[in-house]
A protein has these predicted regions:
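Accessory interdomain/linker segments of ATP-dependent helicases and helicase-like nucleic-acid enzymes
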Residues: 6-8, 12-101
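Short, solvent-exposed secondary-structure boundary/capping segments
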Residues: 126-140
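Catalytic P-loop NTP-binding/switch module of NTPases
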Residues: 140, 144, 148-155, 159-173
Length: 177
């Protein structure tokens, strides 16, 4: 009895990316990049964690996402482990901030160590119920759990969702052990 399941492949012999399409969000056109930068309403310096997530979005590692999850997708993921399109996502992909002024419809130039890495078109901003997120995603609210500790102690007050346009990959430091 053969138990091996055949997987659909593309013409190159590779399995298709999750969600069916690899999302490369890096803008190569310098004029378009400069135009997007000039339209930024705000400039935010990313934490290392946010910069890592921006990089993962830019290179398609979070495909089929084209940016940070909006409030509807966030709620769907923490409650159902699926985005609003029904695709499995175990954890929400969010950008956090303490900025009270930014609102939907505005754009944020994302920098990391002064490097212009991306533009975020804000489609959604909300104040998450972090205790619910911790409980549903990690099964606990205990700060002994490193991810719960990160949610409560490192993430900003607000989550911001929206489309990301990548400019250049952030130059990240090595993880300290």
């Amino acid at each position: 009895m053969e138990l091996q399941q055949k997987t659909k492949t593309d013409t190159n012999g590779l399995i298709p990316p999750y969600g069916g399409e690899l999302k490369n969000l890096i803008i190569k056109d310098k004029n378009l990049k400069n135009d997007l930068i000039s339209k930024a309403t705000y400039e935010f310096e990313c934490s290392e964690r946010n910069a890592c997530d921006v990089e993962l979005l830019m290179v398609g590692a979070f495909s089929p996402l084209e940016g940070f999850m909006d409030e509807n997708n966030y709620n769907s993921v923490i409650k159902n482990n699926r985005n609003t399109n029904g695709l499995l996502f175990g954890l929400p992909i969010v950008f956090d901030s303490n900025n009270e002024k930014v609102k939907a419809g505005e754009t944020i130039l994302l920098t990391y160590k002064k490097q212009k890495i991306a533009l975020l078109e804000v489609s959604s901003k909300w104040e998450p119920e972090k205790s619910l997120e911790a409980k549903l995603c990690y099964g606990t609210n205990s700060l002994d759990h490193p991810a719960v500790k990160m949610i409560f102690n490192e993430r900003g007050r607000f989550y911001i969702g929206g489309r990301v346009y990548g400019f250049e990959l952030p130059i990240l430091s090595l993880i300290h052990i």
